[in-house]
């Protein structure tokens, strides 16, 4: 959850303690791209296997305010996604979604304009179309996504658009040119993400040194063009970070995130405490199964309570791989609580 994309101020968000305020929902593992750095395609479970309408009803009753139709595949491959979004809107839920942009078009975007869409993440990994398409292994993707960004701003002008940008060996030297894409199409935020679990695309020492030298320039350029970084701090290499994504700065992280969020994997029906735990050991991090339990039973169940306590006490090693957004949420929460 990125606080900059949430309408409610932190104080109001924190009043939802022990309610699933923000829910990540992965509809399937199917994708029209074949990204170089993605491990989702190795998963055996593919299509949605739970009743999404029933789930939306349960989440609404439990106090959910936001549903993020997220990755794990491309959400717009699912033929029913617009029906799900329509139902979320009727239930008063806010919607955020992630997409590579390939399956969107003007007709679908016009339809999206009638739903409670608050923010959209698009994935773009280079200011050059050929590099982006080669990393995503989907020819023509760059042209489609950039065109659809402008269409969304035309038909849903108040929506916040964030660009997920996986920093890697192929694009980190051109980060300034990527920021300048703001001059070509309309978006609000850049969300640079350091690549992990892909040694062949991890940075050289020289690239890291060069990035650090240009850090002030990146901030100045973004400010000049009216762009924000979703997480204010993009000084990724200040603390030691490995090609596996381990961050030594997180060793003492106390996590309250599962008291506000959860991740639901529709192909398996498995429920996890957050979006960072879905590829961890299921024996530790899985808190329920919607094929056997209701969402209320999962949320109020003993597994979530036990895991929540361990995370709050900083007992689990997932903290070293925690995404920056989730870290910032925790820092903000404990600062607010004093």
Regions found by a protein language model. Give the residues of each.
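N-terminal pre-core extensions flanking Radical SAM catalytic domains
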Residues: 1-44, 57-61, 242-250, 259-260, ...
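Radical SAM enzyme [4Fe-4S]-AdoMet core and its adjacent flexible, acidic
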Residues: 26, 47-50, 94, 114-267, ...
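Residues within well-ordered alpha-helical secondary structure of globular protein domains
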Residues: 58-61, 87-90, 151, 181-184, ...
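Polar helix-capping/helix-linker motif
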Residues: 105-106, 175, 300-301
């Amino acid at each position: 959850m990125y606080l900059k994309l949430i309408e409610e101020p932190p104080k109001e968000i924190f009043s939802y303690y022990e309610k699933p305020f923000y829910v990540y929902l992965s509809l399937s593992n199917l994708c029209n791209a074949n990204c170089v750095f993605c491990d989702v395609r190795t998963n055996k479970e593919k299509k949605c296997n739970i009743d999404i309408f029933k789930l939306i009803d349960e989440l609404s009753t439990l106090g959910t305010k936001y549903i993020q139709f997220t990755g794990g595949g491309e959400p717009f491959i699912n033929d029913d996604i617009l029906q799900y979004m329509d139902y979320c809107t009727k239930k008063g839920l806010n919607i955020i979604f992630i997409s590579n942009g390939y399956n969107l078009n003007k007709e679908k975007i016009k339809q999206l304009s009638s739903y409670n869409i608050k923010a959209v993440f698009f994935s773009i990994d280079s200011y050059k179309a050929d590099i982006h398409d080669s990393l995503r292994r989907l020819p023509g993707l760059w042209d489609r996504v950039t065109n659809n960004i402008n269409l969304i701003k035309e038909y849903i002008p108040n929506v916040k658009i964030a660009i997920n940008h996986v920093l890697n060996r192929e694009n980190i030297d051109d980060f300034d040119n990527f920021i300048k894409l703001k001059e070509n199409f309309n978006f609000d935020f850049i969300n640079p993400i350091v690549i992990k679990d892909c040694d062949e695309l991890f940075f050289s020492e020289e690239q890291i040194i060069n990035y650090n030298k240009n850090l002030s320039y990146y901030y100045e350029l973004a400010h000049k063009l009216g762009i924000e970084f979703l997480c204010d701090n993009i000084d990724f290499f200040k603390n030691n970070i490995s090609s596996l994504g381990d961050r030594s700065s997180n060793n003492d992280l106390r996590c309250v995130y599962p008291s506000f969020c959860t991740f639901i994997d529709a192909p398996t029906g498995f429920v996890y405490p957050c979006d960072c735990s879905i590829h961890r050991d299921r024996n530790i991090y899985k808190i329920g199964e919607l094929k056997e339990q209701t969402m209320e039973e999962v949320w109020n169940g003993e597994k979530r309570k036990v895991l929540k306590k361990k995370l709050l006490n900083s007992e689990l090693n997932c903290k070293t791989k925690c995404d920056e957004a989730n870290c910032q949420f925790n820092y903000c929460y404990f600062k607010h609580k004093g």
